[in-house]
């Protein structure tokens, strides 16, 4: 992360348990061992020795005398430059860099099971000496909080609103169109024909990490996402997804990855949101300084 050496690193100060979990270094090592084992051409898969090591790396550890209010370093989750992502919504002033952090424990909010995010806009050209060794939490609540570094290859696509937000008449037309495609596929003599396209998974909202566009509400159904400061309807800023595509959205699989095993190319970030969901982060279009909101789908 492009973080000034003289600027305090974001920390979670909310009171919650933080004294038991897996060590980030163990999580990264576990992934490396497993990836290496399955990449072998001969006898792929972990050896007995590797399985023993993997078991050790999966162990949870306790932090003696850890307080529920000790400053807990957040984990850098995403760093997006406007030069790389043309559709990145406007930040305050002439800021060109968005940085996203999260607390590595699901222990926030009234039910003590919510996420905690921290978003920071900055002007990249103002950063002088860069922090080379950011603080890390000693343990994390789950391995999905620890991202693997990835190089972005942004691609612009057209998105459309979630089906539940469309007018009823239009939804009925889409349903009839999908039924006609399914019937046509069933009657086709060509059994190699792929599954017919559908609005939900193939045409409206792509899976994976993305900036802008429309949010999916497939888990909760739509509900108002208005700014808590000025009541303005908020716009989707960023989607953080647990996978780049899945069985229901295979039409979005990149052509370059058509012949790669699914488990190797769908989760490059190794980030897991809740129970394999997606995190939609919203921003106020009138004032990007206003607090962000988010939903998990």
How should these model regions be labeled?
Residues 1-297:
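Preference for intrinsically disordered or flexible, low-complexity segments
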